[in-house]
A protein has these predicted regions:
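Conserved N-terminal alpha-helix of the aminotransferase class I/II PLP-enzyme fold
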Residues: 54, 61-94
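PLP-dependent class I/II
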Residues: 26-32, 36-53, 84-86, 91-390
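Conserved long hydrophobic alpha-helices within structured protein cores
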Residues: 1-12, 67-69, 73, 130-136, ...
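N-terminal "arm"/small-domain region of PLP-dependent enzymes with the aminotransferase-like
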Residues: 1-61
Length: 390
């Protein structure tokens, strides 16, 4: 597989590159786009071939007969994650941000609290607030350099108005693969406080060697009556523009409520996205993912070695995802000055930690889903930008 080729995405209506200068002041011609969580790699050939077949046919009508897609989802979940899913449990959404919004709309009411384990994926908070719900932040604790859950502290934050818990598993931006014990703890917490659990597992295929992701239905089957699962091909295969995702619900009562809401919204599948996803969930796609994970792990090692060599900087150990979470807190520099050095001196666009909620204030998130040469260049620029610390 070729992950080393640098592809010019500037001028292709690409958020990551075409919006970098307007939002961050980093010019696309000389800057490095390491913010938006999509990768710089072309998807596997099977995905390209599926699109070429559609283009050759030349008629782009409404999508129907999703049996092949549903079987591909079921095959992937069983073979890659040991998770058995029935066809009638799978709903197709326009990506998982849309899926999250649908879950909030279906299972909560305006004014209800939605629990987030912060710092966490920034879109969650935005959607919750836009829907007229309340964000309830349950901060993660840093123990031995990585995030852990403090259920006793979280219990103390509950007021009785909370109705939903959104879990990011694996965790973005901290890169944690939650253990069976931690997942059991989340399940018990949701039972204790009568919360619907929405488990966003979009990064579940991007787990580093030596780590194992556990789907929540396997880790805690006892909460099937309050569990909503979310998965997608978009992160795994770098096809975010396809806007497709899965909401998977085992409980019939929850499933009926979600189906009614989807009908009321008039949603229908994206034909291009489902053709791409069907092709991706295949043996060829699986082989590509295996190679991708090895490559990202190599990027992680290069990045961590270079960043951690800068006194006071620390890249949190990455167990999953291609997103490095770097803490600048120990250097004693105002975060505005840190950002100024990264964006103006190093000319790197990253995600600011404040967007991820409580606990993210001293962090920046770097996207390592790129050619190795880009990672090497980013490290060199960071070392030069913070040379006075050495």
């Amino acid at each position: 597989m070729d992950f080393d080729t640098v592809h010019n995405r500037f001028g292709t209506h690409c958020v990551k590159w075409d919006m970098m200068q307007p939002l961050y002041g980093v010019p696309a011609e000389t800057g490095l786009a390491m913010w938006v969580a999509d990768m710089e790699f072309r998807p596997p050939h099977c995905v390209q071939a599926a699109l070429e077949k559609m283009l050759a046919h030349g008629i782009y009508g409404y999508y129907g007969d999703d049996a092949e897609y549903l079987d591909a989802v079921r095959w992937w979940m069983q073979t890659r994650h040991g998770w058995s899913v029935d066809r009638d449990q799978i709903f197709t959404t326009h990506g998982l941000v849309n899926g999250t919004a649908m879950c909030i709309d279906t299972f909560t009411r305006p004014g209800d609290g939605v629990v987030l384990t912060t710092p966490v994926y920034h879109a969650f908070s935005r959607i919750i607030k836009a829907a007229g719900r309340q964000v309830v932040e349950c901060p993660l604790s840093i123990v031995d350099g990585h995030y852990e859950m403090d259920f006793a502290a979280w219990d103390a934050r509950m007021t009785g108005t909370e109705r939903m818990f959104i879990l990011c598993s694996p965790h973005n931006p901290g890169g944690r693969v939650w253990t069976a014990e931690e997942l059991h703890g989340v399940a018990a917490f949701c039972q204790r406080h009568d919360l619907i659990l929405v488990s966003d597992e979009i990064h579940h295929d991007l787990v580093m060697p030596g780590q194992r992701h556990l789907p929540m239905p396997i880790a805690a089957p006892q909460i099937a009556d309050r569990l909503v699962m979310m998965t997608a091909t978009t992160k795994t295969f770098n096809i975010a523009g396809a806007h497709s995702g899965n909401v998977i619900i085992a409980d019939p009562a929850l499933r009926a409520r979600f189906a009614d809401r989807m009908m009321a919204m008039g949603l229908s599948p994206n034909s291009f996205g489902l053709h791409m996803a069907t092709a991706a969930y295949s043996p060829e796609g699986a082989a590509w993912v295996d190679d991708l994970v090895q490559y990202i792990d190599g990027n992680r090692q290069v990045f961590d070695a270079g960043i951690n060599a800068i006194p006071g900087l620390r890249s949190m150990p990455l167990q999953a995802t291609y997103l490095a979470w770097v803490d600048f807190g120990a250097i004693g520099m105002p975060q505005a000055d840190v950002i100024d050095r990264v964006q103006k001196t190093a000319q790197i666009a990253t995600n600011h930690g404040t967007a991820f909620g409580m606990g993210g204030e001293s962090f920046l998130r770097f996207n390592l889903g790129c050619p190795r040469a880009t990672v090497v260049e980013a490290v060199a620029r960071m070392q030069a930008a913070f040379a006075d610390l050495q």
